[in-house]
Regions:
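Beta-alpha-beta core module
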Residues: 1, 61-112
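Short amphipathic alpha-helical coupling segments at ligand-binding clamshell hinges
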Residues: 39-42, 112-126
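Short secondary-structure boundary/capping segments
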Residues: 12, 19-21, 46-48, 82-84, ...
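Secondary-structure junction motif
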Residues: 26-50, 117
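Short beta-strand-to-loop elements that line the ligand-binding cleft
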Residues: 52-62
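Flexible hinge/capping segments at coil-to-helix
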Residues: 1-28, 118
Length: 130
C-alpha cells in the first residue's frame, strides 16, 4: 500500500488519508534513478497517469537519506508503508485514488520442499493479500 510520508509537524500529517489533489503543490523528496531505472520510470509514469506534474525538490540516493529529508521537513514523499520504520520520525498517510503502487516479488527454487519455505510463502501471500 502506498502512503504519503510527512514530517511530524507537516500540516497534512493529521489527515486520515490523502489524494493526489491534496499533494499536487507539495515539494517532493524522491529516490533517484540509482535505486533503479525501472522503479524511477514507473514512479514518474504514475504521476503522469494521475494528471500531476510533480514538484521535485530533492532526489536522494538511499532510503535513510530519504526519510531524514522528510523528517526534517524538506518535503513529503510517497512510499510503501512496509518500508517505514517506527524510528523514522515521520507520519504515513494512506494515498487514495492514485496510480502509484508497490510491487513485490519473492523467489525460491521450485524443487525446494522445506516446510519453512512453504510456511514463509504462505505468510507472505497472506500479508500482501490484505
Amino acid at each position: 500500500h502506498i502512503c504519503v510520508v510527512t514530517s511530524l509537524e507537516h500540516p497534512l500529517s493529521h489527515k486520515e488519508y490523502l489524494t493526489i489533489e491534496d499533494i499536487k503543490n507539495e515539494p517532493l523528496i524522491i529516490l533517484s534513478k540509482k535505486q533503479g531505472e525501472e522503479y524511477y520510470h514507473d514512479y514518474m509514469e504514475s504521476f503522469r497517469l494521475d494528471g500531476m506534474i510533480p514538484y521535485i525538490k530533492k532526489e536522494v540516493d538511499d532510503l535513510n537519506e530519504y526519510m531524514m529529508a522528510i523528517s526534517l521537513g524538506e518535503g513529503i514523499g510517497l512510499t510503501a508503508t512496509e518500508v517505514i520504520n517506527e524510528n523514522d520520525q515521520v507520519v504515513a498517510i494512506p494515498l487514495k485514488e492514485s496510480h502509484h503502487h508497490a510491487d513485490y516479488a519473492v523467489g525460491y527454487h521450485r524443487d525446494n520442499e522445506k516446510k519453512a519455505i512453504q510456511q514463509f510463502m504462505k505468510y507472505v501471500e497472506d500479508y500482501f493479500r490484505l
